[in-house]
Structures are given as C-alpha cells and as structure tokens.
Regions:
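Histidine/lysine/aspartate-rich catalytic loop segments that bind and position anionic ligands
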Residues: 94-126, 130-135
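Hydrophobic secondary-structure block in the mid-to-C-terminal portion of proteins
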Residues: 146-208
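Glycine-enriched alpha-helix->loop->beta-strand junction motifs that scaffold or abut catalytic
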Residues: 32-37, 58-61, 80-86, 100-107, ...
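Aromatic/hydrophobic pocket-lining residues that form π-stacking "cages" and hydrophobic walls in ligand
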Residues: 27, 95, 99, 141
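Catalytic cores of alpha/beta
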Residues: 27, 71-81, 114-122, 159-174
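Glycine-rich phosphate-binding active-site loops on the catalytic face of alpha/beta enzymes
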Residues: 85, 89-95, 128-137, 172-194
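Glycine-rich beta-to-alpha transition loops that act as phosphate-gripper elements at the mouths
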Residues: 17-19, 66-72, 88-91, 108-113, ...
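Conserved N-terminal beta1-alpha1 strand-loop-helix module at the mouth
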Residues: 1-84, 101, 161, 189-208
C-alpha cells in the first residue's frame, strides 16, 4: 500500500533511534509541540518495538512509523504494535506482498532507475532514497526524476539543517527524513528543552 497520502502534508520526518523506551512518549510530545506530526522509529534498538507501541497508545496525534524494515515478520509485529506506516532501505518481493496483504502504508527503498521502475510497477509512487547524500544527493535525484517524473522520494541519510531546504525545493521530493534535530545524546540525557528548540528550527527551515 502506497504511503503518499499519509505523508503528503509532512515536510520533515524525524528518524529516531530510541535506546530507552521511557523517552519515547516525551520525545513524541516534544516533537508535537514543535509542530512535527510524524515520526519514524527505526528498528535498530532493543526498545524500538516497545517505543512504537508506547507512542501509538499514548500520543494518538502523532503519526508513528517504523523504519529499517528488513523482514516480513517485522511488518506483522509493527502493525500489532500500532505503527501506521513502514519504511525500508530497500525492497523484496516478500516485503511488498506482505505490506499489501496487511494494508500497511509502505515506503520501500530504491537507489537506481531499475529499482524505481520495479517499485512503480508494484504501485509504489513514494520511495525511500537512502543513503541520500552518499548516493549523490539532490543532483542524483534530479537526474533520476527527469525520465521518471511520476515518482516521489523520501530521502534520508546524511541530510543536515543546511541541506534540508535544497532537498525540499525539488518537485520530486515529498518529504525528508533526518535526525540532526534529535541527537541520540540529547535523547539519552532527556534534554527535551534543547530537542524542542532544535525541532522548531527544523520546522522553520523545512517550510520552503
């Protein structure tokens, strides 16, 4: 199931690695207060699934997604935990078919024209582009979108406050993912005042 409608009005999605699930709800509330209404919690920590469930149950105003999806079982698990969308750095046949069976809004990853075309043929018009900067950033996206104008991208990886407006200025970019405004160190220190300040700044610079 394509995730375009779900993320169409979102400019920036915080990509969070939550190592302590007890910080999840406070982080979500802080982001909401800063004007951010969606979050991608990556499955890169032992507490990730619990964090997704806590945010889904305690902060219903926040659209919560799960990132770094690699296996079919993970799609089933995040759905049970309350995730509203899923993001993967790539795509496999089993992931695509399972996401469709579960009616889970899914952002599969693509990095080449062939991968993009394959996903378009599966009905996915919003695709993750990762790692964005390492793959050539905005220049690569411009080149890929020239012969493939229908596709839209959700680039993540290496995007900074300085680069964010350049990505969002591209017609082919629906939203970007970033973690520069939710540093892991500040999250572990529970410095939500500083995270709110940085998140508000992120909202300001991404309203291009």
């Amino acid at each position: 199931m394509d995730a375009t409608k779900l993320l169409d009005n979102v400019n920036v999605v915080p990509v969070a690695v939550i190592e302590d699930k007890t910080t999840a709800v406070d982080l979500a509330l802080t982001l909401l207060d800063a004007g951010i209404k969606a979050i991608e919690i990556t499955l890169r920590s032992a507490d990730a699934l619990d964090a997704i469930e806590l945010v889904a149950n305690s902060v219903p105003e926040m659209t919560v997604g799960a990132g770094s999806i690699r296996q079919v079982a993970q799609l089933e698990e995040i759905l049970n935990r309350g995730a509203q969308f899923a993001v993967s750095p790539g795509a496999t046949g089993p992931l695509i078919s399972t996401a469709k069976q579960l009616h889970m809004p899914f952002v599969p990853g693509a990095a080449t024209a062939s991968e993009i075309l394959t996903l378009m043929n599966e009905g996915y018009m919003l695709q993750k582009f990762f790692p964005a900067e390492q793959l050539g950033g905005t220049q690569t996206l411009k080149a890929l979108s020239a012969p493939l104008p229908e596709v839209r991208f959700f680039p993540t990886g290496g995007i900074t406050a300085e680069l964010a407006p350049q990505y969002l200025a591209l017609e082919c970019v629906t939203c970007i993912g970033g973690s520069w405004f939710i540093p892991k160190a500040l999250l572990l220190e529970r410095d939500f005042a500083r995270i709110k300040e940085m998140s508000r700044s992120a909202v300001e610079i991404t309203h291009v």
